[in-house]
């Protein structure tokens, strides 16, 4: 069975793992109420999207 010829250094191991991280969601403030919300989605607090009242109809 094959084994690694050299030990993997801390730096090389960490460089390989730089992409194994959680992505931060794109948060923006609602222009209507100022509440934080996910980008390109309806605001949960006031129910508006792109300046229009979507939920409370």
UniProtKB/Swiss-Prot annotation:
SUPFAM superfamilies: Zn-binding ribosomal proteins. Keywords: Ribonucleoprotein, Ribosomal protein. The keyword Ribonucleoprotein applies. The keyword Cell membrane does not apply. It comes from the Bacteria. Pfam families: Ribosomal_L32p (PF01783). One of its GO terms (cellular component) is large ribosomal subunit. InterPro entries: Ribosomal_bL32, Ribosomal_bL32_bact, Ribosomal_zn-bd. GO terms for molecular function: structural constituent of ribosome. PANTHER family: 50S RIBOSOMAL PROTEIN L32, LARGE RIBOSOMAL SUBUNIT PROTEIN BL32. This is Large ribosomal subunit protein bL32. The lineage of its organism: Bacteria, Bacillati, Bacillota, Bacilli, Bacillales. The gene is rpmF.
């Amino acid at each position: 069975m094959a084994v690694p010829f050299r030990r993997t250094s801390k730096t090389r191991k960490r460089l390989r793992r730089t992409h194994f991280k959680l992505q931060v969601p794109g948060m923006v403030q609602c222009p209507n109420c100022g509440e934080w919300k996910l980008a390109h989605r309806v605001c949960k607090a006031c129910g508006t999207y792109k300046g229009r009242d979507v939920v409370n109809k």
